[in-house]
Amino acid sequence: MQDTSKQYDAVIDECRSLFIKKMSDYGSAWRILRLPSLTDQIFIKAQRIRQLQENEVRRVDEGEKSEFIGIINYSIMALIQLENGVVENPDLNTEQATILYDKHSKITKELMLNKNHDYGEAWREMRVSSLTDLILQKLLRVKQIEDNKGKTIVSEGIDANYQDMMNYAVFAMIHLGA
């Protein structure tokens, strides 16, 4: 399990680095996005990964790895939005956004470590394509919860689904040798 923790941190470090660079380029323009918009961005990334896995021909020179990074970063943005709400104008500088990024990546890693202990690292035996399908399934669940105005009867809330998608994407990146 110690390797998993280190591998997880390496993936998050790569994603975090890109997040910080994009914050420098664009600021926190993403803070205006409502949750369904972030969900749709993650859906686009996951759908592209599935197409890449199924099709031999690629017309855009970007592979699965960059899309999984996008899923991780958009999931953290969604968790930040859930906690802080949507704003009319960007309101976070790079330092503030990075603090929130680190907070949510830490919470999500703790969840992964707890589940990983209980499931005995079963994800290591899974295919990347199965992890992609699980992300797509979680997205459909989130869309349904969003359509239900955030209400669930017996199911986990939206935050748990974003965390699971993020963890599945990290596992996929580890499988891909990130």
Regions found by a protein language model. Give the residues of each.
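Intrinsically disordered, low-complexity regulatory regions
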Residues: 1-178
